Amino acid sequence: MFGLKVKDATVDSSKQSTESLKGEESSSSSTTSSTSTTQRGGSSGDTKVKALQVAVKKKSDSEDNGQIELETNNLANAPIKRGSNNNQQVQLKADDFGTSPSSSESGQSGTPTPWTPWLATEQIHKDLPKWSASILILYDAPYARNRTAIDRVDHLDPKVMTANYPPSWRTPKWNHHGLWDWKARDVLVQTTGFFNPRRHPDWFDQGQAVAENTQTGFDTDDTDNKKQGFRKQGEQSPAPIALPFEAYFANIGNLTWFGQALLVFGICLS
């Protein structure tokens, strides 16, 4: 109802172009980046556009402090595959983000500098007024002086909202673009900040395997914390899925009209 909706792309034969994209790779040594070029052309019967091939490849530690360079990857596939033949999912490690200069300045590889998120749950708890919000509603009041009354509908308390986070949500997985994860671009496009994660459990680490919340399905590893994120202590039935607190700030400003409700962020109304 609110926000943008993205429809699946369909081919319109009446508007079909005779152009197509074709990726063309050139292999090179480990010290130079591989490149991809595009060529225009194709016949009028072409109905498919090929995605460009983009790649990353990590240099050896003795070359340029082990920085990364391009190697074949197809951005149209999700999750992104590393390499063209092994079909393995990308597992980011600390050294994938480069290294800091060596303290001895000897030219050797320095200490790995892993990327860290800019916002963690603990930071939200430290400054509640900054992250709290109140949902107000304005309605017609004929006997009021200005014919308008304001009432508080709900209050967003980040400490309460994050109390039931699964373990992997304790440190939100923001990538270097400032998005929630690799699918967060869909969240930002299709919502104003309020959405039901039960419709898209795959956005949240398979945090809810069944939309009706009959299973927790938290599929990370076999540790004791596997399914504790959706259960209360000592209870057998799963607790309702927690809406990520950051979702409320995904695509809305500090003062936003939402139907007849007015959302005011950064203040606490008791």
Curated annotation (Swiss-Prot):
It comes from the Bacteria. InterPro entries: P1_N. Residues 26-41, 98-113 have a biased composition (Low complexity). Coiled coil: none annotated. Residues 1-10 have a biased composition (Basic and acidic residues). Pfam families: P1_N. Signal peptide: none annotated. Residues 1-115, 215-236 are annotated as: Disordered. Belongs to the adhesin P1 family. This is Uncharacterized protein MPN_462. It comes from Mycoplasma pneumoniae (strain ATCC 29342 / M129 / Subtype 1).
